[in-house]
């Protein structure tokens, strides 16, 4: 089974004010992709937090976009590359997009 070439991973909690950025933006993106006839090229994934398991969602993709609310980010958003060589953080809680990408490079790629 082939996967869409692009994946968008959005995290956040809709019940926590500005932490709802990821899910709200993902919902708008889904509508736009449908309207433009591009939905088949994207897999949209929503979760409360980025987890190690999300590294598996990167397999066989051309590109990935991580969406999350941030603290002290320039308004209204910041778009920046993720360093795959950042050391993965270890936590039983959420991990950063850089850590997800680092796990992907260590385990999947």
Predicted regions and their residues:
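N-terminal catalytic or cofactor-binding beta/alpha core of small enzyme domains
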Residues: 1-109
């Amino acid at each position: 089974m082939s996967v869409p070439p692009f994946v968008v991973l959005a995290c956040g909690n809709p019940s926590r004010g500005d932490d709802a950025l990821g899910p709200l933006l993902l919902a708008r993106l889904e509508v736009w992709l449908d309207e433009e006839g591009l939905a088949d090229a994207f897999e949209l994934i929503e979760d409360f937090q980025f987890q190690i398991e999300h590294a598996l969602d990167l397999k066989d993709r051309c590109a990935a976009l991580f969406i999350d609310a941030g603290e002290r980010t320039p308004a209204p958003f910041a778009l920046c590359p993720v360093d795959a060589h950042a050391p993965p953080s270890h936590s039983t809680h959420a991990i950063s997009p850089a850590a997800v990408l680092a796990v992907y490079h260590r385990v999947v790629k």
